[in-house]
Amino acid sequence: MVKVGVNGFGRIGRLVTRAAFNSGKVDIVAINDPFIDLNYMVYMFQYDSTHGKFHGTVKAENGKLVINGKSISIFQERDPANIKWGDAGAEYVVESTGVFTTMEKAGAHLKGGAKRVIISAPSADAPMFVMGVNHEKYDNSLKIVSNASCTTNCLAPLAKVIHDNFGIVEGLMTTVHAITATQKTVDGPSGKLWRDGRGAAQNIIPASTGAAKAVGKVIPELNGKLTGMAFRVPTPNVSVVDLTCRLEKAAKYDDIKKVVKQASEGPLKGILGYTEDQVVSCDFNSDTHSSTFDAGAGIALNDHFVKLISWYDNEFGYSNRVVDLMVYMASKE
């Protein structure tokens, strides 16, 4: 089992740790966060407003974080190059601060003895992998990889199934996206993106997202064929993708439902879900899929032009894929 260090104990860092303990697929051996001391880590890991209390034991003991009886080394370094991952036995590092997202910056972890780095965010220059879509293109010459974004992880599996079966001529995506930590509780300054600084709980906020264009990086045949935007809405978690696309081959909406259902039960099982239930966003809280196709919500204008809807827990689904990507990488060592 691969030994993992986590840099940044925020939403994704904590939930990757939860996903690791829930699944038992990887071994968390170290956590670094300069802003959260050990006792605070215990509290933050145990209690979660969105996903509920951790089902297990968590305590501080002898300067370590102990989860379900397993001791985890704690570091509080600001500079990633100073974290002694090797001493803690961490082979892979999950870079989840949101700050060190380039090859150069994330590469600092290798100086402390880590063998590989998984960036839990899109990266300008690191190769991006989406489980179920292009993870098989990974090869172990790569030291630093990106798990792309939560939205790309939702959109790409659906786009792959549609493109493989009917061909996507072009498409536009909108994600109706839950609040994240980068937003403001009340109106405040926000650099160049003025709208992003408006109160998150009070507004529907149009925002940019690179998620659709990023699909072109993980599915090269779709490069230049998709783009998209986001609406940030006042919900704490769970988002939904609306993919509106023109199809090469004519398809009835029932044909689309059929191929997505088949994929969800076959090659994309556990990654792409399928439901015909009358669901709403809360129904996907703590769901581990990257994407769940909502068969009842989509519409077709004609046999070549459709709007497809897919839900995702933007925190927990994504965190589970980070774990799955590490498991896959470890299988190639």
Swiss-Prot record:
PTM sites of type N6,N6-dimethyllysine: 3, 64, 192, 213, 225, 258, 261, 332
SMART domains listed in its UniProt record: Gp_dh_N
S-(2-succinyl)cysteine carried by residues: 150, 245
Modified residues (N6-acetyllysine): 59, 192, 217, 225, 252
Any Pfam family the entry gives: Gp_dh_C
Residues bearing the modification N6-malonyllysine: 192, 213
Positions of post-translational S-nitrosocysteine modification: 150, 245
Phosphothreonine PTM positions: 151, 175, 180, 182, 209, 227, 235
Marked site: Activates thiol group during catalysis: 177
Residues found modified as Deamidated asparagine: 7, 62, 68, 147, 153, 223, 314
Positions of modified residues (Phosphoserine): 120, 146, 149, 239, 310, 331
Highest taxon of source: Eukaryota
Modified residues (Cysteine persulfide): 150
Any single Gene Ontology cellular-component annotation: nucleus
Compartmental location: Cytoplasm, Cytosol; Cytoplasm, Cytoskeleton; Nucleus
Recorded domain comment: The [IL]-x-C-x-x-[DE] motif is a proposed target motif for cysteine S-nitrosylation mediated by the iNOS-S100A8/A9 transnitrosylase complex.
Protein role: Has both glyceraldehyde-3-phosphate dehydrogenase and nitrosylase activities, thereby playing a role in glycolysis and nuclear functions, respectively. Glyceraldehyde-3-phosphate dehydrogenase is a key enzyme in glycolysis that catalyzes the first step of the pathway by converting D-glyceraldehyde 3-phosphate (G3P) into 3-phospho-D-glyceroyl phosphate. Modulates the organization and assembly of the cytoskeleton. Facilitates the CHP1-dependent microtubule and membrane associations through its ability to stimulate the binding of CHP1 to microtubules.
Record's protein name: Glyceraldehyde-3-phosphate dehydrogenase
